[in-house]
Amino acid sequence: MKNTNIKSIQLGLALIAAIGMLGSCKKELSVQPSSLSEEKNGNAISASTPISVALNGFGNSLSDSIYVMYSADGELFRDEIPAITLPTAVQQYQTENYQQNDQLSAYTISDKDGNLKSYVSIIRYNERPVALEYNFLGTFKKVLEQREWADLDNEGWHIGGLFEDRDGNNRDVVNLNLLPDEIKNYMTNNYPDDIIVRAFQTKEEAIIVISKNNGGFANVFNKNLELQKHLSICDANCQLEDIEKSNFSTNLLKNLSNTFPNYIFDYADKMNVNGVSMGNLIFINANNTRYAVTVDVNGNILSNKVVF
C-alpha cells in the first residue's frame, strides 16, 4: 500500500510538471509580433496593423495565412467595407489586370478626422492573395507587401518560406538547356522566329518563358506544360538589350520600391526603338506574382503588366 501511495504521488507530480510545461510552451507560441498590436479609433484600427489573409494551401505552406503589410505616413486608420462599394475605377483595374480574380476583402484608409486617404483591395489571383492600394479616387498606387507570421518582425522572408526568393539567390531561374521538350516544341511550332532568352519557374510549377522577336514576349506554361498566356511585354520594333540593376538610377529604384515594396528583381532590358532609348523593361516578382514593368528614361513607371 505504501509503494502504491508513493507511485500515485509521483504520477501526480509528473502530471503537474507536464501541465506546467505545456502552459509555458503555449505562452511562448502565443507571443505575437509587435506589428500586430492594434491601435483603435472607434471601430477602426491602425492602418499599419497587418491584415490576415487565408492561404488555402497555396505553395504547400505549413501556415494557414499570410499578412498584408501597410506602411502608414502619419496616424491613419483602417475600416473594412463591402467590396461592392469600391470605386468603379478600382473594379475596372482589377478586372483588366487580374482576369478571373476573386474579391476577398476591401478597406478604407482614413485619418483620425475621418478624411478618406486611400482604398485597400485584397483579391485572389492564380490561387494566391494579391493586395492592392489605390488613392481616394481609385487610381492604382502600389502592390502591398505580404509576409508570413514568422517574418513580421524581420526582413520579410526565411529560407523554406513562401517568400524565400527575397534573399536574392534567384532559385526560380530555369536553365534553358533543361526546358521541357514540350515547351521547346511548342515554341518552335507556334513562334518559330522567337528566340528564347530566359525562363523562370513559379511556386505553382508554372514555367514563364521570355522570348524576343521584334519585341518581347512572356509565355506562361502551366504545370501541365500547356500554354496559358502569350503576352507582349515590349511593343513591335522595340529592340531589347540587357541592363544590370546596378545601372538603375536612384529615382528608378525608389519608384520600384514604393510601388512594389520588398520586390524581387529578376532581370531588366533597355528598350530601344530605331536606336533611341525609350527606357527600361523590368521583370520582377512581388509576393509571388510576376510583373513586367516599363519605365521611361527618367525612371518613372509607365506601366506594369501582370504576367502570372
Model-based region annotation:
Residues 129-147, 216-234, 289-307:
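A short, surface-exposed beta-strand/turn
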Residues 20-24:
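C-terminal motif of bacterial Sec signal peptides marking the signal peptidase cleavage site
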Residues 2-6, 26-124, 128-130, 139, ...:
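Acidic/polar, low-complexity intrinsically disordered N-terminal segments immediately downstream
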Residues 168-201, 249:
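Acidic, serine/threonine- and glycine-rich low-complexity intrinsically disordered segments
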Residues 119, 127-167, 182:
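Long, acidic/polar, low-complexity amphipathic helices and coiled-coil-like
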Residues 7-16:
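Sec-dependent N-terminal signal peptides
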Residues 100-134, 193-220, 266-294, 307-308:
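Exposed beta-strand-loop-beta-strand "reactive/processing" segments of non-cytosolic proteins
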Residues 86, 90, 148-177, 231-262:
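Long, charged/polar, surface-exposed segments that mediate recognition or autoinhibition
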